[in-house]
Design a protein with these regions (language model features):
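Walker A/P-loop
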Residues: 18-38
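Post-DEXD/H (motif II) to motif III coupling segment of the RecA-like Helicase ATP-binding lobe
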Residues: 141-204
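Conserved interdomain linker/interface between the two RecA-like ATPase lobes of SF2 helicase motors
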Residues: 187-259
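Conserved RecA-like ASCE ATPase "motif II neighborhood" in helicase/translocase motors
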Residues: 101-151, 321-323
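Conserved helix-turn-beta segment of the N-terminal RecA-like "Helicase ATP-binding" lobe
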Residues: 59-95
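N-terminal pre-P-loop "Q-motif" helix
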Residues: 1-19
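Conserved strand-helix element at the start of the C-terminal RecA-like helicase core
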Residues: 50-62, 239-271
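Conserved RecA-like P-loop NTPase helicase motor core
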Residues: 141, 288-416
Length: 420
C-alpha cells in the first residue's frame, strides 16, 4: 500500500471521524489516493462492503477504476461500471442487473465496487441496493440541475458519503438548496487543503502565465466567428514556435468549441505543421470521439496512449479538447496549456490544474531528499505554463483575470468559488 502525504493523511484521518463531509483539495493534490486509502481501510476492517465512486465523465470513471485496482486487487472485490461507455469490466445501466450483481457479491460475503457517472447515478439509486460508502469526485458537478436528484437521493441512502472537489459551488436564491453550502446534503467542509501548502511540499508546481500578444508576430486581422479556426491555428503555431526547443513540450489546447476545434484540424494545415515539428497530435470531443494523429480509437486506447506518452520524456505531443479533459483526468507530463477561449472560473482552475503536476524525476528526487521542494530553479519542470493569446484591451482584461485567479488559488490559498 502507498504512503500518504501529510495533507492526504490529514484528510484520511478526518474521514474516520465523520460519515459525511466535503474534502477540498487543489487539483494535483492526490484526492484519488485519499479515497483509495479510506476504501482500503473499510474493506479490510469492516467486512463485505458496497462502495460507489462517482465521476463527471466516463473517461474519468475508467481512470479512477484503474487507479483503485492498482491498490485494491483482492479477488474478493467485484467491479461493476454503471455508464454507457467502454470498459473491460462488467457494465450495465439497468437497475435490476445492478442489484443482481451487487447482491450476488454480497451474498458470497464479498465486496462490490461500482464506478459510475453523475449522469447514470440515478440508475444506482433505482436499484435499491444498500451502499456503505460513496465518493463523489469533482463533486461540484453534482450541483447541476440535471445531476442533483441523484446526489440528493444518495445523501439519504449511503451510510458514508464524501464529496471531493477543488472548486466548490455555492447556491443562492432559487438554487440555494443545490449548492454545496447546503450542509443537509453535502455536509460541512471537514478538510480544506490550501494550494500553497502543496507547493511547499513539492506535491505540485506553481503555474506561470505567459500571455501571447497576437499583434506581435500574430495575425493582422480581427478574430471573428467566421475566421476563428484560421486565426486560432495561426496563433497556436506562433506560440509553439516560441517554446523552449531544449525541452519536449506536452501541450494541452483548450479550444473555443467543438466546431472550431474540428475546423482547425480539418480545414487548416495545423496538423501538418505540428507533425513537421515532430509533434504527435491527439484530440477528443464528445461529438467526434477520440483520435491519435489521424486514426480514430476507442477511449481506453486513447487514455492508455495518453498516459504512456505523458511518461515518455522523449515524446512531444499536442492534445486538443473542448471540455472533456478539463476535470479530473490525470495526464502525466503535461508542460503547457494554451487557452484559446475565455474559460469560466471553475474550468479555468481545472485546466490549469492539468499542467501543474510535478515531473516524475523531480518527485523521485524529492522523495530521496536530493531536491528541496521549494527550490524550483533546480526542478526539471519548475512551472506549469499557461498561455493565452491576447489582443487589445479585451485581451489584457482576460490576462488580468487569469492572473487574479492564479494568485488567489496558489498564493493566497483561497479555493475558487463559483455559483450554481
Amino acid at each position: 500500500m502507498f504512503s500518504l502525504r501529510p495533507h492526504q493523511q490529514r484528510a484520511f484521518a478526518v474521514m474516520q471521524e465523520h460519515n459525511v463531509g466535503q474534502i477540498v483539495v487543489p487539483t494535483g493534490g492526490g484526492k484519488t489516493f485519499i479515497m483509495i486509502a479510506d476504501a482500503y481501510k473499510h474493506l479490510r476492517d469492516n467486512g463485505p462492503q458496497t462502495i460507489v465512486v462517482v465521476a463527471p465523465r466516463i473517461l474519468l470513471a475508467n481512470q479512477l477504476c484503474e487507479e483503485f485496482l492498482e491498490q485494491l486487487h483482492s479477488k474478493r472485490n467485484h467491479i461493476m461500471h454503471v455508464h454507457s461507455g467502454e470498459t473491460k469490466h462488467f457494465s450495465t445501466t439497468k437497475s435490476d442487473k445492478i442489484a443482481l450483481f451487487n447482491n450476488t457479491a454480497r451474498a458470497c460475503d464479498e465486496n462490490c465496487i461500482i464506478f459510475t457517472t453523475y449522469h447514470s447515478l440515478g440508475r444506482v439509486v433505482d436499484s435499491g441496493i444498500n451502499i456503505d460508502t460513496i465518493y463523489f469526485d469533482e463533486a461540484h458537478n453534482g450541483c447541476g440541475r440535471a445531476h442533483f436528484a441523484g446526489v440528493y437521493a444518495m445523501s439519504k441512502i449511503a451510510n458514508r458519503k464524501f464529496y471531493f472537489t477543488a472548486t466548490p459551488r455555492i447556491g443562492r436564491g432559487s438554487s440555494a438548496f443545490r449548492g454545496m453550502n447546503n450542509a443537509e446534503v453535502w455536509g460541512n467542509v471537514i478538510c480544506n487543503v490550501p494550494a500553497p501548502e502543496l507547493i511547499e511540499q513539492g506535491a505540485i508546481v506553481s503555474p506561470k502565465i505567459l500571455p501571447f500578444d497576437a499583434n506581435d508576430g500574430g495575425v493582422e486581422f480581427a478574430r471573428t466567428k467566421h475566421n476563428m479556426p484560421e486565426v486560432d491555428a495561426y496563433n497556436l503555431m506562433q506560440i509553439v514556435e516560441g517554446l523552449d526547443s531544449d525541452h519536449d513540450a506536452k501541450i494541452l489546447v483548450a479550444a473555443p468549441n467543438t466546431r472550431v476545434l474540428w475546423a482547425m484540424l480539418t480545414q487548416t494545415d495545423v496538423m501538418q505543421q505540428l507533425k513537421d515539428k515532430g509533434y504527435d497530435i491527439m484530440h477528443i470531443t464528445s461529438k467526434h470521439g477520440a483520435y491519435i494523429n489521424k486514426t480514430k480509437v476507442g477511449r481506453e486506447k486513447f487514455f492508455q496512449t495518453l498516459t504512456e506518452w505523458g511518461l515518455d520524456d522523449d515524446r512531444k505531443f499536442v492534445i486538443f479538447h473542448y471540455s472533456i479533459l478539463s476535470e479530473g483526468i490525470n495526464v502525466p507530463g503535461l508542460t503547457h496549456t494554451i487557452l484559446l477561449r475565455n474559460l469560466p472560473i471553475v474550468e479555468m482552475a481545472q485546466t490549469i490544474g492539468r499542467v501543474i503536476r510535478v515531473h516524475k524525476d523531480d518527485r523521485d528526487a524529492i522523495n530521496k531528499g536530493a531536491l528541496i521542494p521549494t527550490q524550483f530553479e533546480f526542478f526539471r519542470k519548475p512551472h506549469g505554463y499557461v498561455t493565452v493569446p491576447v489582443c487589445g484591451k479585451a485581451g489584457n482584461a482576460i490576462t488580468t483575470r487569469l492572473q487574479r485567479v492564479v494568485d488567489a488559488i496558489f498564493k493566497e490559498g483561497v479555493p475558487p468559488l463559483s455559483f450554481v
